Amino acid sequence: MAIYRFVVRFNRSDNPRALGLLKDAHALGFAELKLIQCQDLYFIEGDLSPEECMRLALNLLTDPVTQSAEWDELPGGRIDLVADVSMVEVALRPGVTDPVADEIVRAAHELGMAGIVRASSGFRYIIQGAVVETAVELARRLLANMVIQRWTIGEIEPSFPG
């Protein structure tokens, strides 16, 4: 069965979540960071048509006024970043309850998308001004809660609740 990765971005880089994380990173001593982009990740397993992916993105996963979404079927294409930009993805550890994912499945079924089997959620952080070592330290100290979340540099593999 197919697994889709939906990436939801804010249309503006000055959204409160990104600005708050950048401020926190600077307070922790990561003064070299220029920008942190916060994006929501949703992994959806099921049989979806392109039209259903569009409906899911527009009607359920985004606020179309402030956000936009893109999606692909896993494995997706490779993401190329420039030299001073790193990407960290964070997701819940296997076995941790994901109420956002539960609601996605429930709401998608209400919208008539019965082909959705399960979902999981996470976050993507694009960090400008960070070499990989800095991104690793930032993930450990700020971006992930190690008790309930796992993280990786680059794209994370989805895990779904049992």
Can you describe what each PLM-predicted range is?
Residues M1-G162:
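Core nucleic-acid recognition elements
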